[in-house]
Amino acid sequence: MKYLITIVGPTAIGKTALSIALAQHFKCEIVSCDSRQFFKEMTIGTAVPSQEELNSAKHHFIQNKSIFENYTVGDYEKEALAKIEELFEANDFVILIGGSGLYVDAILKGFDEFPEIDPNVRAEVNTNYEKLGIEYLQEQLKNLDPEYYQKITLENPQTLQNPQRMMRFVEVCIGSQKPYSSFLNLKKNNRNFTPILIGLDADREIIYSRINQRVDIMMNEGLLKEAETLYPNKALNALQTVGYRELFSYFDGDFTLPFAIEEIKKNTRRFSKRQLTWFKRNENTKWFDYSTDRNEIIHYIVENLKSSI
């Protein structure tokens, strides 16, 4: 039997350290499921594992793409599943570490298939978003797929404020001439592994404190310079994310630098709250306090393995 040990939790909670400890114990490799860490141009602002951490265990899907590539969750599902299957040929265990709930779900449950979209359609949607803002995307989705718009409004309203997701919805509607929702739940996905889900959590005050500290460290490590280098490409889909978006507003003259830094902290805290909301929907996840001794978590996994045999 093959086991995918999946580690989830909010940003800055300690998932990387735990994943390395588990990879070393089970003598296996790590597949990253953090959609922000795929891109090689984004290092500091995405908290990519350090070189020492990368050397401690073999990682996959870390800085393996460029921000200039169009890389969807469907692309990731296909590539990551192929890599996981390859790793299972040599080992009964693979570690999946996830901060991006949608991408974790794609691996564990499968994702719906969507048609190829003309790059010109994608570029036009991106340009209109840059000119008209998130309201343009919201209005487009409301007109092109009112059923799905209503579903998001009721079940996951924060998605309406997510430029990456909204641009994807709209480009599929326009490019396919069909509602986005018409492509959902059309296939059943089978997985040839057993997932073991581990969640890390902490009191909100601790999470927020760790986030604030991480942002300060990022700024000291050169996040401002990294964002400045990326600023000419600020309209790219991959850069519509916390940590960069706020500094782009500083370069635009809309924010002072101290205000931009506080916005990064605030928006990252909000992001962590959304992460927890998403991950806690899965009742099969075993949650541990972030300070739990790693041997206790390893013991839980080993006992879980015994019961599944």
UniProtKB/Swiss-Prot annotation:
ATP binds at G9, P10, T11, A12, I13, G14, K15, T16. Keywords: ATP-binding, Magnesium, Nucleotide-binding, Transferase, tRNA processing. Belongs to the IPP transferase family. It comes from the Bacteria. It comes from Flavobacterium johnsoniae (strain ATCC 17061 / DSM 2064 / JCM 8514 / BCRC 14874 / CCUG 350202 / NBRC 14942 / NCIMB 11054 / UW101) (Cytophaga johnsonae). Its EC number is 2.5.1.75. Substrate binds at T11, A12, I13, G14, K15, T16. Catalyzes the transfer of a dimethylallyl group onto the adenine at position 37 in tRNAs that read codons beginning with uridine, leading to the formation of N6-(dimethylallyl)adenosine (i(6)A). Pfam families: IPPT. It catalyses: adenosine(37) in tRNA + dimethylallyl diphosphate = N(6)-dimethylallyladenosine(37) in tRNA + diphosphate. The record marks S100, R122 as: Interaction with substrate tRNA. One of its GO terms (molecular function) is tRNA dimethylallyltransferase activity. InterPro entries: Dimethylallyltransferase, IPT, P-loop_NTPase. It is an enzyme of class 2 (transferase). Residues 34-37, 164-168 are annotated as: Interaction with substrate tRNA. GO terms for biological process: tRNA modification. Monomer. This is tRNA dimethylallyltransferase. Its cofactor is Mg(2+). The keyword Nucleotide-binding applies.
